[in-house]
């Protein structure tokens, strides 16, 4: 058999373990017969890579993906021209509860391939069949070190290799033609011997079963270790609760209609081969590049997602705020491109993954979000900002239940202005709208001003404005003062001239081929700009505008761009005055700070609190720290008024510092890696090594330096091995 078919039910993140069921395998003794196949095969299994994503098992209420794996130098067959053949990607994730296979052989081959690549062997611990038909109904596949051997004649006794290891998967037949993983245990209790594992019965059997055609195929170069990953999907059987609701004119997709159009395919217009070549070339230079494809039942391509190693590394450091840009879909561009976007320590955008989507259905968004989450090792963002779309909103709550979903303020204001047809030639309404949205400091003030505005302009029956107001807690700044946004709320998403991160590269008529040809150039310019900003922040001394100690303090800490923004707040302290304490309750006090805005003077309430440990906490009604990540002018004036010569350290965010560590990997002492746990060593060392590999690909000099470093490292490790104990 060539390749394996794996049916995966995606899941919430590891932080959502309470949502993940633990299915139990139920066997009726009246209908099934237990068969024990305790093959005797000696060997020892390996460490498990740290890809611990507990996939939620919900056959009827979620959309699923079918992961197709084509082993190295084996040819994949059975796909039409819309499906990828011999594509290159990373190996499959570890087995998880909820995986489904088209046959028992596929399930066995998948687990055996997983074991072979990691370095252990498997055997059938037990299986059971129906009494009448002898049809196999279930099985348990275990690590070869499971259990203990019975003592036999001492003269013929072989070396004991079993350790009572509990690693296993439990399978059962469902729907007459599909096998499902009910239970998984990945932990081993013994040392590992990958070389011995490759000589085991299960792996020899797998190697000898390769087809003649496969054996005659030329093998890829030894330095290219690649595998194909393809995600298939079937239509969910149950309709989510939101499917029955209608959409307003301000929303951008038909949730109930698109959800059932499973036959729709991605129209690449001749760009399929270019996409295939693009993935292949990227993987030759970036081993940790990932892509996943969503194929319909007929093999046609529906959706594609890809992400490079740098993006995955950057997300581990800047994963607090994530934006999802669907400008191309919302405006019917020729290129159905979507992008996941983050914000780096310079306040600039970084690309955290791209996709090509066939439609804007709930099912499509769920597939995409789960594909992205899987590539990010199951770590969801804290804040997820999107445009307003009911299908997307439902998918976000399905895949990221713990994330705070917010709407792009720019997209909301754009939709509101577009809905007021009779006022589009006038600047009066946009000006009034901006005053209400940005000028109100308290909820009651905002709601009163909103009501007065819609009455003034005769919009009480405007459906879009009514729906936007119902969702006001997701986009209006007055409701978001307890949500850290890193300055992202006003980033342009949705109905704008071009996708903001690809501005200048993607236009309405940009083809897939044109986009792919400029993709690496775009990324190179982004990385080069970030490197220049890093260099500027580390080497240049910013020019100070005032003599205030806060400015000189942050000049040594913040990156150049963030410091310039903070510098504006320090300069604006001169327009603030009249600090007055209006209330005190123990350690907490309420102050009013006045600010002169043109000819007007406005009051800003600031809460000032000191703890027993003399730690200061401040909160301003303007919400400046939550929106921007550094303190506002009102708090700075109050801190100075109360005698603080430095900004408290809790208000100096690590994400804005010029000395932020760019290794993006866990340190041994960080608490995320247990030095005493061998299962985590592989993942930790692999990440470190891959970072050097990525840097080594930049130039000949980088490659030479990386090679020398690896050679020196290998010598040191060999010295430890040969060192007498």
From Swiss-Prot:
Matching Pfam families: FAR1, MULE, SWIM
Domain MULE: 327-416
InterPro entries in the cross-refs: FAR1_DNA_bnd_dom, FHY3/FAR1, MULE_transposase_dom, Znf_PMZ, Znf_SWIM
UniProt function note: Putative transcription activator involved in regulating light control of development. May have a role in controlling flowering time.
Localization: Nucleus
Chain residue ranges for the region called Disordered: 1-24, 190-224
Keywords in alphabetical order: Metal-binding, Nucleus, Zinc, Zinc-finger
Keyword check for S-adenosyl-L-methionine: no
Any one cellular-component term (Gene Ontology): nucleus
Tissues of expression: Expressed in hypocotyls, rosette and cauline leaves, inflorescences stems, flowers and siliques.
The keyword Nucleus appears for this protein: yes
SMART domains referenced in this protein's UniProt entry, alphabetically: ZnF_PMZ (SM00575)
Any GO MF annotation of the entry: zinc ion binding
Family statement: Belongs to the FHY3/FAR1 family.
Name of this chain's protein: Protein FAR1-RELATED SEQUENCE 8
């Amino acid at each position: 058999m060539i390749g394996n078919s794996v049916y995966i039910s995606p899941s919430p993140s590891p932080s959502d373990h309470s949502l993940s069921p633990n299915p139990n395998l139920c066997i009726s003794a009246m209908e099934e017969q237990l068969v024990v196949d305790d093959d005797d095969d000696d060997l020892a299994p390996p460490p498990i890579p740290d890809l611990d994503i507990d996939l939620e098992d919900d056959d009827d209420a979620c959309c699923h993906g079918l992961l197709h794996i084509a082993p190295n130098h084996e040819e994949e067959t059975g796909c039409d021209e819309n499906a990828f053949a011999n594509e290159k990607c990373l190996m499959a994730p570890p087995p998880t509860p909820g995986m489904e296979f088209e046959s028992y052989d596929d399930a066995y081959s998948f687990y055996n391939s997983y074991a072979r690549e990691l370095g252990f062997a498997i055997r059938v611990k037990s299986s059971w069949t129906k009494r009448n038909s002898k049809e196999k109904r279930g099985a348990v596949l275990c690590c070869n070190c499971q259990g203990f051997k019975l003592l036999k004649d001492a003269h013929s006794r072989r070396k004991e290799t079993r350790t009572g290891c509990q690693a296993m998967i439990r399978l059962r037949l469902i729907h007459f033609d599909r096998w499902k993983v009910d239970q998984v245990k990945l932990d081993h209790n013994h040392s590992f011997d990958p070389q011995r594992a490759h000589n085991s019965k299960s792996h020899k059997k797998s190697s000898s079963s390769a087809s003649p055609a496969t054996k005659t195929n030329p093998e890829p170069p030894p330095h290219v270790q690649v595998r194909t990953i393809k995600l298939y999907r079937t239509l969910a059987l149950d309709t989510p609760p939101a499917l029955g609701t209608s959409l307003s004119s301000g929303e951008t997709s038909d949730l109930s209609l698109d959800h059932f159009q499973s036959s729709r395919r991605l129209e690449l217009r001749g760009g399929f081969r270019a996409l295939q070549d693009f993935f292949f070339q990227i993987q030759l230079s970036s081993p940790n590049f990932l892509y996943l494809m969503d194929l319909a039942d007929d093999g046609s391509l529906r959706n594609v997602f890809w992400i490079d190693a740098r993006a995955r590394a950057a997300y581990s450091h800047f994963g607090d705020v994530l934006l999802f840009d669907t400008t191309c879909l919302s405006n019917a561009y020729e290129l159905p491109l979507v992008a996941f976007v983050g914000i780096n320590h310079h306040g600039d955008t970084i690309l955290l993954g791209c996709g090509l989507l066939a439609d804007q259905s709930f099912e499509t968004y769920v597939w995409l979000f789960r594909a992205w989450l899987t590539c990010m090792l199951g770590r969801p963002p804290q804040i997820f900002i999107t445009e307003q779309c009911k299908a997307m909103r439902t998918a976000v709550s399905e895949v990221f239940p713990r994330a705070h979903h917010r709407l792009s303020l720019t997209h909301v204001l754009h939709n509101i202005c577009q809905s007021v047809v009779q006022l589009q030639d006038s600047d009066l309404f946009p000006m009034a709208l901006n005053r209400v949205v940005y000028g109100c400091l308290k909820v009651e003030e905002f709601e009163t001003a909103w009501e007065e505005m819609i009455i003034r302009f005769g919009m009480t029956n405007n459906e879009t404005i009514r729906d936007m107001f119902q969702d006001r807690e997701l986009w209006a700044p007055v409701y978001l003062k307890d949500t850290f946004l890193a300055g992202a709320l006003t980033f342009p998403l949705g109905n704008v001239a071009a996708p903001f991160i690809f501005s200048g590269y993607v236009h309405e008529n940009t083809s897939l081929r044109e986009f792919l040809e400029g993709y690496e150039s775009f990324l190179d310019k982004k990385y080069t700009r970030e490197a220049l900003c890093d260099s500027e922040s580390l080497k240049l001394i910013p020019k100070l505008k005032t003599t205030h100690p806060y400015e000189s303090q942050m000049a040594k800490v913040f990156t150049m761009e963030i410091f310039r923004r903070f510098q504006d707040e320090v300069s604006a302290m001169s327009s603030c005055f009249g600090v007055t304490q209006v209330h005190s309750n123990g350690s907490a006090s309420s102050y009013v700070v006045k600010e002169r805005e043109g000819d007007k003077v406005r009051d800003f309430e600031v809460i000032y609190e000191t703890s027993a440990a003399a730690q200061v906490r401040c909160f301003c009604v303007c919400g400046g720290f939550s929106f921007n990540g550094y303190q506002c002018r009102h708090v700075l004036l109050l801190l100075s008024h109360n005698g603080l010569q430095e900004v408290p350290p809790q208000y100096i965010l690590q994400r804005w510092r010029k000395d932020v560590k760019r290794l993006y990997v866990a340190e041994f002492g960080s608490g995320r890696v247990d030095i005493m746990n061998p299962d985590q060593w592989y993942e930790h060392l692999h990440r470190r090594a891959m970072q050097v590999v990525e840097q080594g690909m930049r130039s000949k000099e980088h490659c030479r330096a990386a090679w020398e470093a690896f050679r020196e490292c290998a010598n040191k490790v060999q010295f430890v091995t040969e060192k007498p104990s």
